Regions:
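Cytoplasm-proximal transmembrane signaling helix
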Residues: 9, 13, 204, 264-320
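Extreme N-terminal signal-anchor transmembrane helix of membrane signaling/transducer proteins, especially
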Residues: 2-41
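Solvent-exposed, extracytoplasmic
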Residues: 84-100, 177, 181-219
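Extracytoplasmic/periplasmic ligand-binding sensor regions of membrane-associated signaling proteins
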Residues: 99-100, 111, 117-185, 191-194, ...
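Short, hydrophobic beta-strand elements of compact beta-sandwich sensory domains
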Residues: 168, 180-187, 252-279
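Extracytoplasmic/periplasmic sensory segments of membrane signal-transduction proteins
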Residues: 41-49, 53-149
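Membrane-proximal, non-catalytic sensory/regulatory domains of signal-transducing membrane proteins
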Residues: 110, 140-173, 199-203, 207-208, ...
Length: 333
């Protein structure tokens, strides 16, 4: 009878173990998929935060430039027809606006090549006309004349200021006549500070594929090779996750175009693998516990339901002993 108990218990336990293992595998698969999708969505959301930061930065400075243009255009035409009148009437407006947004430079380039310049580096003086800057050869001047909208330069190194700036320029017309080209120089450091405060390991490439803004300032080091990220992005496109190797470490990333820039977010593959492995570890422990409990319970359940068979076996043995004259007593079943 003990042999039957063991065999039945073993069969029942093997079936239960198989079912629990299958259940565990299926559960792990769906858990892994859920964690993977959740993590990727979280990283995508963080990338969108950086994208929105860049867009808001651009929108704010464009609104500033339009407001400045409007105030200049609203001046009487007599205030804009001579250099002296422009200095006296436009100069204070340029200085006021520069202070309001803490710009590096705010200026008005005239048709004769001169520029009325308000500088942060020379704040004590009122804006003055200069003719030594060769403004007509500058992109901000030429491109603004080609469009009716605001032209925005990519971040570039200003040779005079010795720092990276972003220029917003707009051609100004009054009564159908060109007054000049308005320019506003914003330090790219302002954008860097905004990006630095965004969550996640995000950064911005300029048109030359150099990082100029990042949450991790170590990435601004020009000696770092970022080609693995750029190459993976080229193969996968905007907002598509990719994997790449960096210093023998597997990493995940996603990038998207934001105007002239490329915004990216990257993380170690561990950010996905760790919670998956943790979930797998917990499920394995739970599976072992469930199998152990199942084995014990099934053994006792089988033993309980087979106990009447033991009485029947005893009764039958006694009966056959009686009819074979081996005993004079018969046990009741």
């Amino acid at each position: 009878m003990n042999s039957i108990k063991i065999k039945l218990s073993l069969i029942a336990n093997l079936i239960a173990i198989f079912a629990l293992i299958v259940l565990g595998i299926v559960s792990f698969y769906f858990t892994k998929t859920s964690l993977y999708e959740s993590t990727l969505k979280n990283q995508t959301d963080l990338l969108k935060v950086t994208q929105s930061t860049v867009e808001d930065f651009r929108s704010t400075n464009q609104s500033f430039t339009r407001a400045l243009e409007k105030d200049i255009v609203n001046l009487p035409y007599q205030s804009l027809i001579t250099e002296e009148n422009i200095i006296n009437n436009v100069g204070p407006i340029l200085k006021y606006y520069r202070h309001s947004i803490n710009a590096l430079n705010v200026y008005l380039g005239l048709n004769n090549g001169k520029v009325l310049l308000s500088q942060k580096s020379n704040d004590a003086k009122m804006p003055e006309l200069r003719d030594d800057l060769d403004i007509k050869t500058k992109d901000w001047y030429q491109e603004a004349l080609k469009t009716n909208d605001i032209f925005v330069t990519p971040a570039y190194l200003d040779t005079i200021l010795k720092q990276y700036v972003i220029t917003y320029s707009k051609a100004i017309y009054k009564d159908g006549k060109i007054i000049g080209v308005l320019g506003v120089d914003i330090p790219s450091e302002d954008l860097q500070n905004l990006v630095a405060n965004t969550p996640g390991n995000t950064f911005l490439f300029d048109q030359k594929n150099k990082i100029f803004a990042a949450t991790n300032k170590e990435l601004l080091n020009p000696s770092i090779d970022h080609s693995p990220v750029l190459n993976a992005y080229k193969l996968n496109g905007d907002n598509n996750f990719f994997s790449y190797k960096l210093n023998n470490e597997e990493r995940l990333g996603a990038c998207t175009k934001v105007f002239a820039y490329t915004a990216c977010i990257t993380e170690s593959a561990d950010i996905i693998n760790k919670p998956i492995f943790k979930a797998a570890y917990i499920q394995v422990i739970a599976l072992i516990v469930m199998i152990s409990i199942s084995v014990i319970l099934l053994y006792f359940i089988v033993s309980k339901y087979l106990s009447p068979l033991a009485a029947i076996q005893t009764g039958l043995t006694s009966f056959f002993d009686f009819i074979n004259y081996k005993t004079k007593n018969v046990s009741t079943i």
